[in-house]
């Protein structure tokens, strides 16, 4: 053994080829500080051995290296620039040491080689991947750029255009795609990986492969004619900005870094990367996006833990077909859990099966599935007009019409047919789980399971704990949601649960602006372009449906009369009463037609303005700051109330619910990250300016205390 640490082992193989194996404690390898220090020491030990002729990097895990340890980032990025620069320079010195070894080097890549893992393989002369490999630089998704030489080496290995696509999108690349552009030199079967890498090194030692020329190319400026370079980078900037927009600076910064470094050798090019990395690491966007990544890990970790208490769900059932039932059935079946889809009407079953078939056909058309897989998934969905096939289900999801009496009746019925230990969940967006539980003989096996529409696209599932729901019930539904490929958050029962409870105060703020003459299209523009929502409030209401919005608003007003009660008609009422239901009937705030691709196309409709003018008078202009304040303050305060009341367990889960359930702008990180970035005291001062508008604008006592103590919701 040449070198051994808890994370890295180096041994000498035959033919004087050294093998460096990353094998940290835990399930994956990461480039944390300990591993970087170990790699540095391992390389020193290797350099001291005079007989070594080549080096192969391998992994003792199912995956190579998943990247840097992101849990270290927020603390590290909060340090002074000098400390951060020192860390980046030290890490790069290690990668340079690997690249500068006096003999050929190769990486044997299996599973993920992402971020720092990808940058490590770029520092070797040869790269061999197996068929399981996924290679990429996802840093821009975290609001930063590669910091261990990725922007310098990748363009010199695969060309600037290919490198910019990899870096700015942050996507994982399949081995065959990596081979096509020259990021890897061969793709082999997993069992042949190490042998193939060693053979390539033997060929290099025997001078059949010119490893020194490859290395020199990575040290040198890019070989791009000046005019071609200018055109290439100008085009890239336009394309990247069109996708990333002004709220996500990292992809544009990556283009700029590659452009500036193109004419430089390795040392100067790395300095350009370091400076850009540090600048981005200090941004609020990086803090928000890294926070989302860490929050996602926390939520998924909780779900994994719940799996230990969960009942094994081998089969499921959904009651109520149609679009929603079909979406749930598709999601369950496509992830491997057979499901019965039960309805009282054959046309509804046909619609549900049609929805599943449509989603599967789209996957086949995009090359993401095959006709054989499609047939297998459809065979996992059993349509039924009676309860007989439901009796074997481990979990039953009730998804009938959103009406308390109908749901209560269906829940009471199905309980008679299922096994004693079957779990029953209601897919409801507004109806109290405690109320529905009253229709059950065994309320401990019952909870809420709120899917968001469209089911196949929306990642969030709210699992709603009723006062009688058992821990096994909650754990089993969380585990089933995870098995379906969803991100579950557990919330306690209250009107609107968590997501709808915080959404409708936002709509109330919007209604308030319209009642004073605000222009809904202007408000949408501000909330989309400036705040960053995927849809403004008017457009979102049209997509949700004004009938659904009208009903949910009434539920919220009844549940929280002090804050959400209404004294008269608002804009939602005006649209609903004039049968303007949104996209579903072609007219809401906007008018809708179908474009050439069959998608709804939105247009301004003068009729909407006439109706609103008749109800609320002449239009009045509001500036962007006031629009943002008056819509967002109610949502933010209601989110804080949900945390204080224990409806949601943590700021992390609340923020993930907002990002995954509502499309809260990821670059802002969620309500609690947004509050911490803004400063709780600054927010309280802003809210106090609007406190005269009513209870939705009045902060809680606990918020005032936190503000007075200069506190925050996240611990840095």
Curated annotation (Swiss-Prot):
<dbReference type="GO" id="GO:0008692">
    <property type="term" value="F:3-hydroxybutyryl-CoA epimerase activity"/>
</dbReference>
<dbReference type="InterPro" id="IPR006108">
    <property type="entry name" value="3HC_DH_C"/>
</dbReference>
<dbReference type="InterPro" id="IPR001753">
    <property type="entry name" value="Enoyl-CoA_hydra/iso"/>
</dbReference>
<dbReference type="GO" id="GO:0004300">
    <property type="term" value="F:enoyl-CoA hydratase activity"/>
</dbReference>
<feature type="binding site">
    <location>
        <position position="500"/>
    </location>
    <ligand>
        <name>substrate</name>
    </ligand>
</feature>
<protein>
    <recommendedName>
        <fullName>Fatty acid oxidation complex subunit alpha</fullName>
        <ecNumber>4.2.1.17</ecNumber>
        <ecNumber>5.1.2.3</ecNumber>
        <ecNumber>5.3.3.8</ecNumber>
        <ecNumber>1.1.1.35</ecNumber>
    </recommendedName>
</protein>
<comment type="function">
    <text>Involved in the aerobic and anaerobic degradation of long-chain fatty acids via beta-oxidation cycle. Catalyzes the formation of 3-oxoacyl-CoA from enoyl-CoA via L-3-hydroxyacyl-CoA. It can also use D-3-hydroxyacyl-CoA and cis-3-enoyl-CoA as substrate.</text>
</comment>
<feature type="binding site">
    <location>
        <position position="343"/>
    </location>
    <ligand>
        <name>NAD(+)</name>
    </ligand>
</feature>
<dbReference type="GO" id="GO:0070403">
    <property type="term" value="F:NAD+ binding"/>
</dbReference>
<keyword id="KW-0520">NAD</keyword>
<comment type="similarity">
    <text>In the C-terminal section; belongs to the 3-hydroxyacyl-CoA dehydrogenase family.</text>
</comment>
<comment type="similarity">
    <text>In the N-terminal section; belongs to the enoyl-CoA hydratase/isomerase family.</text>
</comment>
<feature type="site" description="Important for catalytic activity">
    <location>
        <position position="119"/>
    </location>
</feature>
<dbReference type="InterPro" id="IPR012799">
    <property type="entry name" value="FadB"/>
</dbReference>
<dbReference type="InterPro" id="IPR008927">
    <property type="entry name" value="6-PGluconate_DH-like_C_sf"/>
</dbReference>
<comment type="subunit">
    <text>Heterotetramer of two alpha chains (FadB) and two beta chains (FadA).</text>
</comment>
<feature type="binding site">
    <location>
        <position position="324"/>
    </location>
    <ligand>
        <name>NAD(+)</name>
    </ligand>
</feature>
<dbReference type="Pfam" id="PF00725">
    <property type="entry name" value="3HCDH"/>
</dbReference>
<keyword id="KW-0560">Oxidoreductase</keyword>
<feature type="binding site">
    <location>
        <begin position="400"/>
        <end position="402"/>
    </location>
    <ligand>
        <name>NAD(+)</name>
    </ligand>
</feature>
<dbReference type="InterPro" id="IPR036291">
    <property type="entry name" value="NAD(P)-bd_dom_sf"/>
</dbReference>
<dbReference type="Pfam" id="PF02737">
    <property type="entry name" value="3HCDH_N"/>
</dbReference>
<dbReference type="GO" id="GO:0006635">
    <property type="term" value="P:fatty acid beta-oxidation"/>
</dbReference>
<feature type="binding site">
    <location>
        <position position="453"/>
    </location>
    <ligand>
        <name>NAD(+)</name>
    </ligand>
</feature>
<dbReference type="GO" id="GO:0016509">
    <property type="term" value="F:long-chain-3-hydroxyacyl-CoA dehydrogenase activity"/>
</dbReference>
<keyword id="KW-0413">Isomerase</keyword>
<feature type="binding site">
    <location>
        <position position="407"/>
    </location>
    <ligand>
        <name>NAD(+)</name>
    </ligand>
</feature>
<dbReference type="InterPro" id="IPR029045">
    <property type="entry name" value="ClpP/crotonase-like_dom_sf"/>
</dbReference>
<feature type="binding site">
    <location>
        <position position="429"/>
    </location>
    <ligand>
        <name>NAD(+)</name>
    </ligand>
</feature>
<keyword id="KW-0442">Lipid degradation</keyword>
<dbReference type="InterPro" id="IPR006180">
    <property type="entry name" value="3-OHacyl-CoA_DH_CS"/>
</dbReference>
<keyword id="KW-0456">Lyase</keyword>
<feature type="binding site">
    <location>
        <position position="660"/>
    </location>
    <ligand>
        <name>substrate</name>
    </ligand>
</feature>
<dbReference type="InterPro" id="IPR050136">
    <property type="entry name" value="FA_oxidation_alpha_subunit"/>
</dbReference>
<dbReference type="GO" id="GO:0036125">
    <property type="term" value="C:fatty acid beta-oxidation multienzyme complex"/>
</dbReference>
<keyword id="KW-0511">Multifunctional enzyme</keyword>
<dbReference type="Pfam" id="PF00378">
    <property type="entry name" value="ECH_1"/>
</dbReference>
<feature type="region of interest" description="3-hydroxyacyl-CoA dehydrogenase">
    <location>
        <begin position="311"/>
        <end position="716"/>
    </location>
</feature>
<comment type="pathway">
    <text>Lipid metabolism; fatty acid beta-oxidation.</text>
</comment>
<feature type="active site" description="For 3-hydroxyacyl-CoA dehydrogenase activity">
    <location>
        <position position="450"/>
    </location>
</feature>
<feature type="binding site">
    <location>
        <position position="296"/>
    </location>
    <ligand>
        <name>substrate</name>
    </ligand>
</feature>
<dbReference type="GO" id="GO:0004165">
    <property type="term" value="F:delta(3)-delta(2)-enoyl-CoA isomerase activity"/>
</dbReference>
